[in-house]
């Protein structure tokens, strides 16, 4: 019988939400230091090098998870959605604080944490550090970032003409990268990082 105790933190959503979730993960660990922290998420690259995270699983790749962490095991489950809370919808609290309040854990100003290995550092240097100008990143199209995802959603995405105006205004002073879907409109004057280039995107914060 497994006598270990666990905190199981489930994160879904985009890259930015996962970065914010690292602060929530630290808060969970600080509130329950006697429990091993298990993370199930869409972007495992964000969590895999963090020292206070004991194990990382990608959503959909959780073989024997129930047997290892749920059945007859002392585990706490953190799997609610902060975007659907009253505090977040009414903008009463920042996302991280809303998240921690929803879980009933004490927030002590925990901040996001990112850890990169040497390969990721080299990839970041090769991708994001070209030229002398500071970089600017514009992400015009949200939602699912798969190859066959819808290219544009009028209720969520930035209109192409407005995005192009932003690039035209800043391109003299910044090296501009557009993170975009394979089939989404490409902005003139920007370097395009496709949504399928996950390794490059996850190293953006190094710049």
Where do the PLM segments sit?
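Catalytic machinery of carbohydrate-active enzymes
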Residues: 1-207
């Amino acid at each position: 019988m497994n006598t270990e105790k666990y905190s199981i933190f489930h994160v879904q959503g985009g890259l930015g939400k996962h970065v914010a979730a690292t602060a929530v993960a630290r808060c969970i660990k600080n509130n329950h230091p006697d429990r091993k922290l298990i993370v199930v998420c869409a972007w495992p690259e964000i969590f895999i090098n963090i020292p206070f995270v004991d194990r990382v699983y990608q959503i959909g790749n959780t073989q024997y998870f129930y047997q290892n962490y749920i059945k007859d095991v002392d585990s706490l489950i953190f799997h609610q959605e902060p975007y659907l809370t009253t505090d977040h919808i009414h903008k009463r609290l920042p996302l991280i604080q809303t998240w921690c309040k929803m879980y009933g854990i004490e927030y002590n100003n925990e901040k996001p944490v990112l850890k990169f290995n040497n390969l990721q550092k080299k990839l970041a240097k090769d991708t994001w550090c070209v030229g002398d100008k500071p970089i600017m990143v514009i992400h015009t199209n949200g939602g699912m970032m798969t190859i066959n995802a819808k290219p544009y959603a009028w209720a969520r995405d930035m209109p192409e003409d407005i995005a192009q105006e932003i690039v035209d205004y800043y391109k003299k002073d910044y090296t501009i990268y557009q993170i975009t879907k394979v089939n989404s409109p490409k902005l003139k004057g920007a370097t395009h990082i496709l949504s399928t280039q996950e390794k490059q995107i996850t190293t953006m914060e190094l710049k």
